[in-house]
């Protein structure tokens, strides 16, 4: 008699919610269906958009006979790493001028977070510091908790961020939680376009956050997934990161080029490391090289080449900025239009938070029962938290979505 499968005791894992939502949407035959759950940009025709500048650079790469498919270095394409870090920190960054910046090409923003988390678990402020508290915002992107847990961190906590009652930032709660955090705790910060709330601190509020973090010796780990995509302005979206440099912080910054280049399936990311002196950066990168070697060994080239070629060419860079602004402007327009329709319908509650928020996502304030109603009765797909992808709205479905939200709120408490 053959023994049972060695996999017979493996439990079925829960599906990843946002991808399950998209699968359900695809299978729904209803012609009215709207997908507000997907974490990717859509045009006004509800299609993915390949940026014109990306098409141009892809053609240029395809025609370059000097290129081949040899392995990239373990830390990635050098031109990409330097261009990516420069984009985050700015051309005039004192950290760049003083050569105390390093970069690691990664598999998207998630890969950058994981390499950073693995390094911190091994080497942060000593060795083997898996008991160091890691703070993430409440709420945050669900992968933040999972990545730091998988890296071995045992004490993951949340800091207050979203005030559900006023539908905005709970600054005082945020600052109080930072004040009470043990010294040298790791704080995960959203650089701009906070996911899922779309609510960002103002520059003045960032200054207060930095002040508390400085005197409590807290370590910032920025997640920058939307630079340029949030406001349409690269500098504005990197303001917090650059301010922390000016205040003398050492920090990590996980960068993603999925959204602002539309390179979702190329997995293009970078981990920017800012230290106090060049020597420590070299040592940090030497250890990160060891971590990358046992994780993916060498990163893929295509997406990194597209980004590096674009950022290093003044003409292509300007064209890319225009493409990014096109996406950001469409999202801003959809925010205004949705708010105007809800207010015209006299939908209960206030709706200014929709236009106060920024970036791809909006935290609507809808509760799980109202979300369930929208999915089951109206075929409008969104997360149970009430988060919507604003770029899923179009001139063709806005009226339907607004009246459906109005109906959900007036019918379901």
Swiss-Prot record:
| Phosphoserine PTM positions | 149
A single Gene Ontology CC annotation of this entry is:
cytosol
Q: Which GO terms describe its biological process?
A: 2-oxoglutarate metabolic process; aspartate biosynthetic process; aspartate metabolic process; glutamate metabolic process; glycerol biosynthetic process
Q: What is its main location?
A: cytoplasm
Residues bearing N6-(pyridoxal phosphate)lysine are 259
E.C. numbers: 2.6.1.1, 2.6.1.3
Residues reported to bind L-aspartate: 39, 141, 195, 387
Write one Gene Ontology MF term.
pyridoxal phosphate binding
Reaction(s) catalysed by this chain's protein: L-aspartate + 2-oxoglutarate = oxaloacetate + L-glutamate; L-cysteine + 2-oxoglutarate = 2-oxo-3-sulfanylpropanoate + L-glutamate; (2S)-2-aminobutanoate + 2-oxoglutarate = 2-oxobutanoate + L-glutamate; 3-sulfino-L-alanine + 2-oxoglutarate = 3-sulfinopyruvate + L-glutamate
UniProt keywords (A-Z) are: Amino-acid biosynthesis, Aminotransferase, Cytoplasm, Phosphoprotein, Pyridoxal phosphate, Transferase
Q: Which cofactor does it need?
A: pyridoxal 5'-phosphate
Q: Where does the record say this protein resides?
A: Cytoplasm
Q: Which Pfam families match?
A: Aminotran_1_2 (PF00155)
Q: PROSITE patterns in the record, alphabetically?
A: AA_TRANSFER_CLASS_1 (PS00105)
What is this protein's function? Biosynthesis of L-glutamate from L-aspartate or L-cysteine. Important regulator of levels of glutamate, the major excitatory neurotransmitter of the vertebrate central nervous system. Acts as a scavenger of glutamate in brain neuroprotection. The aspartate aminotransferase activity is involved in hepatic glucose synthesis during development and in adipocyte glyceroneogenesis. Using L-cysteine as substrate, regulates levels of mercaptopyruvate, an important source of hydrogen sulfide. Mercaptopyruvate is converted into H(2)S via the action of 3-mercaptopyruvate sulfurtransferase (3MST).
Question: Which family does the UniProt entry place this protein in?
Answer: Belongs to the class-I pyridoxal-phosphate-dependent aminotransferase family.
The annotated subunit structure for this chain is: Homodimer.
Miscellaneous information on this protein: In eukaryotes there are cytoplasmic, mitochondrial and chloroplastic isozymes.
Instruction: Quote the protein name from its UniProt record.
Output: Aspartate aminotransferase, cytoplasmic
Query: Per the UniProt entry, what species is this protein from, by scientific name?
Result: Macaca fascicularis (Crab-eating macaque)
